[in-house]
Amino acid sequence: MQYKGFKPYPFQRGIIDDILNKDDMFYTMTCGRQIGKTLLLINMLLYYGINKPKSTLLWVSPFYSMGVKVLSEIIDAIEDSGIVNEANKSEKIITLINGTRIYFRSAEKPETIRGLSIDYAFIDEAQDVSDDAFNKSILPTLTAK
């Protein structure tokens, strides 16, 4: 997997290969600071969004400001690529031309996650997401399908 602008470092390549070659429900990373975890996660989100048509994906950031930043970065990176059908910053949803919908939510307000049925969830900085937010809001969206 290599898209314009993203060339994984060897350790990232190992993580990507591990994720793509397994069918596990959960995959977690424990890594040092400032080594590209969020960038790797963004690229995995886009990989699944592009390669799993009509999927529903969820990006969860522990804090609202982090989620808005990631949403803006992704829109800036892909808006002219031809893969975006609609990017709604106010609703925090990107819809791709293949029917995939990507929701961006914050664990600060887990009630905004409830009610969604998600195929794949991507949780950035998961150590800052409360057990309550994960167990009562995020996990049920994955098991609803």
Model-derived features with residue positions:
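Phosphate/NTP-binding elements of NTP-utilizing enzymes
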Residues: 1-145
